[in-house]
Amino acid sequence: MDRVTVSSLKEMKEAGQKIAMITAYDYPSALFAEEAGAEVLLVGDSLGMVVLGYDSTVPVTMEEMLHHVKAVVRGSKRSMVVADMPFMSYQASYTDALYNAGRFLKEGGAQAVKLEGGGEIAELVAKLVTAGIPVMGHIGLTPQSVNALGGYKVQGKDLKTAQKLLDDAKALADAGAFAIVLECVPAALAAKITESIPIPTIGIGSGVNCDGQVLVYHDVLGMYPRMLPKFVKRYADLSSLIKEAIRQYVQEVKEQQFPEEKHSFTMAPEILERIY
């Protein structure tokens, strides 16, 4: 079965078909997400927070990302796998960016990379695309720049920042990006950006009129009993199910209810008798 491609996503936009993207961080999450029909699996640097326990995405390294990208690729056959470029893997120089992005495709097996930033990285995006590396953009609330942005806030609510986001989207599209994530952008502005560029927009907290949507795997499944951003919809409460299952296991071990006879293996009694 052929994987979803850059062309596939553009055709979906042109046909008015919505794109479903979700994060995946390992073999089982990739397997489940693909079987559920997601066209795109994003190996997000959000793994730093939901998998590795960091306070933000900033500490995530290339080696950590590559480890998880490889697992997601092994767990999928049809979905496009997009690898997040972690903080400082592309900001220092074009050489760094090309080398690291190339590793995601060559070593990791990903089909594309995602970079945070607007017009200021357009030239870099163009160079990566020229080198044969498909690039997904990411504007609005960019988590790697959360310190510079003053926290996790909606972006583009005033005239100056709204115009900049539109200009950024156009610059990335002109540079050859095949899609752009719009994070925490007012819905009306996201709709205007979506209709102003020829490539798909993938929204997260940016309204229903984007060409697609993305959410974090763990948030969708309710795997952490934590406060969620306004834009997250929790479709399950796995944290309760997981804790209850493990609680029952622990209790049965302590009360010698597990393992039962059906969980154990047997041997001939005469063999046991001959052991001394």
Curated annotation (Swiss-Prot):
Q: What does this protein do?
A: Catalyzes the reversible reaction in which hydroxymethyl group from 5,10-methylenetetrahydrofolate is transferred onto alpha-ketoisovalerate to form ketopantoate.
What positions does UniProt annotate as the active site of this protein?
E183 (proton acceptor)
Organism encoding this protein? Carboxydothermus hydrogenoformans (strain ATCC BAA-161 / DSM 6008 / Z-2901)
Q: Which GO terms describe its molecular function?
A: 3-methyl-2-oxobutanoate hydroxymethyltransferase activity; magnesium ion binding
Which cofactors, if any, are listed as required? Mg(2+)
Which GO terms of type biological process are on file? pantothenate biosynthetic process
The record lists 3-methyl-2-oxobutanoate as bound by: D45, S46, D84, K114
Tell me where the signal peptide lies.
none
Localisation = Cytoplasm
Protein's name in the database: 3-methyl-2-oxobutanoate hydroxymethyltransferase
Cofactor, free-text remark:
Binds 1 Mg(2+) ion per subunit.
Biological or metabolic pathway of the protein? Cofactor biosynthesis; (R)-pantothenate biosynthesis; (R)-pantoate from 3-methyl-2-oxobutanoate: step 1/2
